[in-house]
Amino acid sequence: NNVALISPRRIGKTDLLHQCFRQPEIKEKYHTFVIDIYATSSVRDFVNVFGKAVLDELRPKGKSVWEGFLNVLSSLRSEISFDINGQPTWGIGLGAITNPIATLDEIFHYLNHADKPCLIAIDEFQQITKYGDDANIEAALRTYIQRCHNSHFVFSGSHRHLMGAIFTS
């Protein structure tokens, strides 16, 4: 079952989601992801934020957990950076996403085959209506979500009319 959570901005939807996902009984049984897409303006941005949120959430759970995600993504890159003291640090992140829909397909493939069920909250979900680069993103996401039997979604938004239009069309 999926849920839409709609209220004005700055009311506490995001804090509520984080609080729910921090509950021990949720953390034990599910992989949880909160994806804030407010600052996204394209499908590519959305896919980048989505993939990064999944990777960042899985990384502390151990190598075997996040390796499962890394193995399905083709748009990965290794990165070397330097901390404030000049010490090099190595990491893995999302690289250039040349085909956002293919990468989205890979992310949903992982979610559907993860070792535990997944709870995914997409915050400011109405933002997808503003993506000019792919008018079909709503239909694509609807299809992915309907076929993703290992995950449940919370669609959080602050614009009632846009959220209503998404879920009634």
Regions found by a protein language model. Give the residues of each.
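Catalytic NTP-binding/metal-coordinating core of nucleotidyl cyclase/transferase enzymes
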Residues: 163
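Short, aromatic/basic amphipathic alpha-helical patches
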Residues: 21, 167-169
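Conserved Walker B catalytic segment
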Residues: 2, 90-160, 168
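P-loop NTPase nucleotide-binding core
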Residues: 2-3, 7-11, 15-119
